A protein has these predicted regions:
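Bacterial N-terminal signal peptides
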Residues: 15-24
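Bacterial N-terminal signal peptides that target proteins for export
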Residues: 2-15
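Extracellular glycan-recognition regions
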Residues: 26-231
Length: 231
């Protein structure tokens, strides 16, 4: 067992996760090259004791805010894709809510921009000072789906009118897999879900490098087929 950063007593069972790194085999439309990184390549920031396991599926069960960071910095252009399922099986944390992610995240207040230079508790507001792209699918207890471009200012999480979706077609369905694709390709920043582009931003000052995290709060999520490669 390991104690994740910011969460005393949280359990982490070690195994392997299939992941495609941003490598030559991922470029040019080629099938992604799948690798098996060590569990040490991941960092957990959790408000309360949480349980995360790795295998063919990443299982994340948490009673409060949790960010699961891939520890290696990514450089654009990049596409991150995965399948996700919101578990509803009667468990204590089986709330269908908050399939979220940060990508191209950096801390503008520290040299090098590392998101790990400052210890964070896993509370959502503690990420306000990052420059990052953020998507929240089924946030606010599965009532909203939103995209934001953080600007590194505490208390300021800009939200454009077209980046705040409601309606059942934009929310999570219990126990059903959904495919998510996060894109940072020069000025083109986008989120795709099940083959449909739900958010797009023409960013005149794009975040071209940074870190990726899965993010949730009081929920039980399963993640599989995670790949990081070229758009």
């Amino acid at each position: 067992m390991l104690n994740p950063a910011g969460s005393k007593g949280s359990g982490l069972r070690l195994a392997a996760l299939a992941l495609c790194l941003s490598a030559a085999g991922c470029a040019g439309g080629a099938r992604p090259v799948v690798t098996m990184p060590q569990a040490a390549d991941w960092r957990i920031e959790a408000e309360q004791a949480a349980f995360v396991t790795f295998g063919d599926v990443i299982d994340i069960e948490t009673p409060a805010g949790l960010s699961l960071w891939y520890a290696r910095e990514l450089k654009g252009p990049v596409a991150i894709e995965f399948d996700a399922l919101a578990v509803s099986e009667g468990g204590a944390n089986d709330e269908v809510s908050d399939l979220n992610a940060f990508w191209m995240a950096g801390d503008p207040h520290v040299r090098g921009g590392s998101v790990f230079a400052k210890k964070r508790s896993g509370a959502f507001a503690e990420y306000d000072d990052l420059k990052t792209y953020y998507v929240g699918i089924g946030g606010n207890r599965n009532t909203t789906t939103r995209f934001r471009r953080y600007v590194g200012e505490p208390g300021n999480r800009p939200l454009l009118p077209g980046h705040d979706l409601k309606g059942a077609e934009n929310l999570l369905v219990p126990n059903r897999w959904t495919h998510v694709r996060l894109i940072a390709d020069g000025r083109t920043i986008a989120v795709e879900r099940d083959g449909r582009r739900i958010f797009a931003l023409d960013d005149a000052q794009p975040y071209a490098r940074g870190w990726f995290a899965l993010r949730t709060t009081k929920s039980h999520l399963r993640i599989r087929n995670l790949r990081i490669g070229k758009p």
